[in-house]
Swiss-Prot record:
It comes from Escherichia coli O139:H28 (strain E24377A / ETEC). Belongs to the NhaA Na(+)/H(+) (TC 2.A.33) antiporter family. PANTHER family: NA(+)_H(+) ANTIPORTER NHAA, SODIUM ION/PROTON ANTIPORTER NHAA-RELATED. This is Na(+)/H(+) antiporter NhaA. It is a multi-pass membrane protein. Its main location: membrane. It holds the Pfam family Na_H_antiport_1. Residues 1-11, 81-96, 131-154, 201-204, 237-253, 311-339, 381-388 are cytoplasmic. The gene is nhaA.
């Protein structure tokens, strides 16, 4: 019991559980004895009906769209705190992750096109390596425990959120044909209500969560990635203390263990089970997976590092307090963990063309993401001194 308490008290425990869940998913998805059970679990239908409103999704989509909205709510709360009171409080500090994210989307896409521009079919997947899986990137960072400066963690969070917002915009503009304007209208009204609640000084967290559920439902029905709702709600919950209590900080404290020990491991288990059946070396070295691997493993860190260097040289932004440029470069490598968002874009790009292309894209995403995780973790482990 003492050892168990010590483990869960460790800053690295959440990351360790997430990695174990991902490995378990890979084993189960590729084992003849368990692959059927694994996929049956993910395809289990779950229906929610309130009056005429009906949401009918399988277990995988409930995990990715609903539970991960809670994770993004927590991320929104943490980034807001740093924007208002912490390491992103000045304009130049806040500009740094924005500039980094822009570079981290442009360069991987260009590198992918360098491999695939001549093929009009695979060319459609240009946005695949532009995405970052914030959950897995933060999970790998968590393995380093307390040696990670808070400012570096917040930089990764802010960068990944902007990256995700960019990916959502790309999906809406280039990969979505049937956006529901009515649902987007409801979402806009819900956001306006959240803003009014904040301006009027309403401090009951439950009211924001209730409006957030309406917002989440509207965003889900609109065809846009529903997890965006979590970030928006997090930004509107009041941070300012009154009588020694802050609604945002209190909710952040409540959500942390649920996200670290339930939501993120479940997310990893549901999404890491990529089948390796039929994988050959010839297929792996074809232009589609090679373009994705190059985009994630080379394009991401190159784009982030280059744009950060330019921002510093032109005095457009400052390094986060207590961090070094080498640490920023290592975080850039971690951002090459594209995984679930990249897989989602691949399914949109190739789903109506050739299912086999999705499998090769998944393989490229898997190789690029795992390589980025291992190299990024190793570099940071060398660059970060253990806390005393």
């Amino acid at each position: 019991m003492k050892h168990l308490h010590r483990f869960f008290s460790s800053d690295a425990s959440g990351g360790i559980i997430l990695i174990i869940a991902a490995i378990l998913a890979m084993i189960m998805a590729n084992s003849g004895a368990t692959s059927g059970w694994y996929h049956d679990f993910l395809e289990t239908p779950v229906q929610l009906r309130v009056g005429s409103l009906e949401i009918n999704k399988n277990m995988l989509l409930w995990i990715n769209d609903a539970l991960m909205a809670v994770f993004f709510l927590l991320v929104g709360l943490e980034v807001k705190r740093e924007l208002m009171q912490g390491s992103l409080a000045s304009l130049r500090q806040a500009a740094f992750p924005v500039i980094a994210a822009i570079g981290g989307m442009i360069v991987p896409a260009l590198l992918y096109l360098a491999f695939n521009y001549a093929d009009p079919i695979t060319r459609e997947g240009w946005a695949i390596p532009a995405a970052t899986d914030i959950a897995f990137a933060l999970g790998v960072l968590a393995l380093l425990g307390s040696r990670v400066p808070l400012a570096l963690k917040i930089f990764l969070m802010a960068l990944a959120i902007i990256d995700d917002l960019g990916a959502i915009i790309i999906i809406a503009l280039f990969y979505t044909n049937d956006l529901s304007m009515a649902s987007l209208g409801v979402a806009a009204v819900a956001i306006a209500v959240l803003a009014v609640l904040n301006l009027c000084g309403v401090r009951r967290t439950g009211v924001y969560i209730l409006v957030g559920v309406v917002l989440w439902t509207a965003v889900l029905k609109s065809g846009v990635h529903a997890t965006l709702a979590g970030v928006i709600v997090g930004f509107f919950i009041p941070l300012k203390e009154k009588h020694g209590r802050s609604p945002a900080k209190r909710l952040e404290h409540v959500l942390h263990p649920w996200v670290a020990y339930l939501i993120l491991p479940l997310f990893a288990f549901a999404n890491a089970g990529v089948s390796l059946q039929g994988v050959t070396l010839d297929g792996l070295t074809s232009i589609l997976p090679l373009g994705i691997i190059a985009g994630l493993l080379i394009g991401k860190p190159l784009g982030i590092s280059l744009f950060c260097w330019l921002a510093l040289r032109l005095k457009l932004a400052h390094l986060p307090e207590g961090t070094t440029y080498q640490q920023i470069m290592a975080v850039g490598i971690l951002c090459g963990i594209g995984f679930t968002m990249s897989i989602f874009i691949a399914s949109l790009a190739f789903g109506s063309v050739d299912p086999e292309l999705i499998n090769w894209a998944k393989l490229g995403i898997l190789v690029g993401s795992i390589s980025s995780a291992v190299i990024g973790y190793s570099w940071l482990r060398v660059r970060l001194r253990p806390s005393v």
